[in-house]
Swiss-Prot record:
<dbReference type="GO" id="GO:0004056">
    <property type="term" value="F:argininosuccinate lyase activity"/>
</dbReference>
<dbReference type="GO" id="GO:0042450">
    <property type="term" value="P:arginine biosynthetic process via ornithine"/>
</dbReference>
<dbReference type="InterPro" id="IPR000362">
    <property type="entry name" value="Fumarate_lyase_fam"/>
</dbReference>
<dbReference type="InterPro" id="IPR024083">
    <property type="entry name" value="Fumarase/histidase_N"/>
</dbReference>
<keyword id="KW-0456">Lyase</keyword>
<keyword id="KW-0028">Amino-acid biosynthesis</keyword>
<comment type="pathway">
    <text>Amino-acid biosynthesis; L-arginine biosynthesis; L-arginine from L-ornithine and carbamoyl phosphate: step 3/3.</text>
</comment>
<dbReference type="InterPro" id="IPR020557">
    <property type="entry name" value="Fumarate_lyase_CS"/>
</dbReference>
<dbReference type="InterPro" id="IPR008948">
    <property type="entry name" value="L-Aspartase-like"/>
</dbReference>
<dbReference type="InterPro" id="IPR029419">
    <property type="entry name" value="Arg_succ_lyase_C"/>
</dbReference>
<protein>
    <recommendedName>
        <fullName>Argininosuccinate lyase</fullName>
        <ecNumber>4.3.2.1</ecNumber>
    </recommendedName>
</protein>
<dbReference type="InterPro" id="IPR009049">
    <property type="entry name" value="Argininosuccinate_lyase"/>
</dbReference>
<dbReference type="GO" id="GO:0005829">
    <property type="term" value="C:cytosol"/>
</dbReference>
<dbReference type="GO" id="GO:0006526">
    <property type="term" value="P:L-arginine biosynthetic process"/>
</dbReference>
<keyword id="KW-0963">Cytoplasm</keyword>
<dbReference type="Pfam" id="PF14698">
    <property type="entry name" value="ASL_C2"/>
</dbReference>
<comment type="similarity">
    <text>Belongs to the lyase 1 family. Argininosuccinate lyase subfamily.</text>
</comment>
């Protein structure tokens, strides 16, 4: 087979070889059926590159105009779903270039002057990922807003706070929800910080060493909205640390969603019954008619494992690669794409689901009345009366053990009984008639009246501050 015949096979590099690539290898190495989602960003980058080439006198202005005309038609075909993607053309870049050349002739062949697919794909990914980060930050904002609204509605609602899944102290449900707002706020900050490193232009690095053409990289960066250019051509084409950093931030987003999901599943359980989730976010059973299953939070837990796996996959992908570009890097896209899709879908669903959560304050309060949730308040009461904390801790532990045997709560004991079971001896008189005020749930949460505390007034203040941050 002649080299001219090989060139007709479609590979941009086929003139170098004496036999065509096997069909199996074509399928194995092709990326077009997943990287075609970069198409509009590929066009965007190519238009900026063409404008720079014309500005620098590397191609004629007439060629640039033809390239723009052809790209406009290709974009319309892609958006209409009429673009024909060909496996023989390997990837998104060569498919678009081949179509451009078919439309505008030699002008299309001149577009690739001064660049390589190595810096081209790195640019496409950064353009695409920058756009997706912006979208994720909007979705994080929507979820945070929904959590703040639900927290405000429940600033006075009391439920048991847990450590080790054992009743610890009373907290307000609003305070509990604000904890997740803090997590998602940090997630948004991490995304914004990650975006800074994504927003650097690789184009101009060419294959690995730069190009001999008199290009203007800063012009292209400005055209594409990048903050600047990648400063080393080898690094620009070969590293994917920006994608790894994004996946790490995304894994934390999903980890926080997963923690919230676990609590939603627990709270919705009939044995707990703190909340109900709207029917449109649940499924039933094909055999058990009574079932209402919290599939959305359960799936979010499961999908978190997949996103975490993508992070490890990308780290493993990069760990053994020498400089510069290697074909291994083609494997960066599918995990990155799936990570974005999973995070976007999850955040969109949760932002819609949270406002529809039905809170059951009576069930929460009943649970908070079990497990001696105000035991720490009794110890603090004794400390304020002058008892050392360790002695107070021991006295309350004696009282709790007595309540266990009597099957009652601390608040059910009279002052005389509290004195008797405390083991304080002549110091038992420190327990006065005012003791029961600190053993109420309302008294307990109201006492934590400081920044970061669970008191309703602090919860409302924290919500107001969080909204300023969100809207600022």
């Amino acid at each position: 087979m002649s080299t001219s015949q090989l060139a007709k096979k479609g590979e941009a590099w086929s003139a170098r070889f004496s036999e065509p690539m096997s069909d199996l290898v074509k399928r194995y190495t092709a990326s077009v059926f997943f990287d075609k989602r970069l198409a509009l960003f590929d066009i965007q980058g190519s238009l900026a590159h063409a404008a720079m080439l014309a500005k620098q006198g590397i191609i004629a202005e007439a060629d640039r105009a033809e390239i723009e005309r052809g790209m406009a038609q290709i974009k319309a075909e892609i958006e209409a779903g009429g673009f024909e993607w060909k496996l023989d053309l390997e990837d998104v870049h060569l498919n678009i270039e081949a179509r451009l050349t078919a439309l505008v002739g030699d002008a299309g062949k001149r577009l690739h002057t001064g660049r390589s697919r190595n810096d081209q794909v790195a640019t496409d990914i950064r353009l695409w990922l920058r756009s997706e980060i912006d979208n994720i930050m909007v979705l994080l904002g929507a979820l945070r807003a929904a959590l703040l609204d639900l927290a405000e509605q429940n600033a006075d609602t009391i439920l048991p706070g847990f450590t080790h899944l054992q009743v610890a102290q009373p907290v307000t449900f609003g305070h509990h929800l604000l904890a997740y707002n803090e997590m998602f706020t940090r997630d948004a900050e991490r995304m914004a910080d990650c975006r800074k490193r994504v927003n650097r232009l690789p184009l101009g690095a060419a294959a690995l060493a730069g190009t001999s053409y008199p290009i203007d990289r800063e012009f292209v960066a400005q055209q594409l909205g990048f903050d600047g250019v990648c400063r080393n051509s080898l690094d620009a084409v070969s590293d994917r640390d920006f994608a790894i950093e994004f996946c790490a931030a995304a894994a934390l987003v999903m980890t926080h969603v997963s923690r919230f999901s676990e609590e939603l599943v627990l709270w919705m359980s009939p044995r707990v019954g703190f909340i109900d989730i709207a029917d449109r976010f649940c499924t039933g059973s094909s055999i058990m008619p009574q079932k209402k299953n919290p599939d959305v939070p359960e799936l979010a837990r499961g999908k978190t494992g997949r996103v975490n796996g993508h992070l490890i996959g990308l780290l493993t992908l990069m760990k053994g690669q020498p400089l510069a570009y290697n074909k291994d890097n083609q494997e960066d896209k599918e995990p990155l794409f799936d990570t974005v899709d999973t995070v976007v879908d999850t955040l969109r669903i949760f932002a819609d689901m949270v406002p529809g959560i039905t809170v059951k304050p009576e069930a929460m309060r009943a649970a908070a009345l079990q497990g001696y949730a105000t035991a720490t308040d009794l110890a603090d009461y004794l400390v304020k009366k002058g008892l050392p904390f360790r002695d107070a801790h021991e006295a309350v532990a004696h009282a709790v053990r007595a309540c266990d045997s009597r099957q009652c709560d601390l608040a059910d004991l009279s002052v005389a009984e509290l004195r008797e079971v405390s083991g304080l001896g002549d110091k038992a008189a420190l327990i006065g008639d005012d003791v029961h005020a600190v053993l109420t749930l309302e008294g307990s949460v109201a006492a934590r009246d400081h920044i970061g505390g669970t008191a309703p007034a602090q919860v409302r203040a924290a919500i107001a501050e969080a909204r300023k941050t969100l809207n600022g």
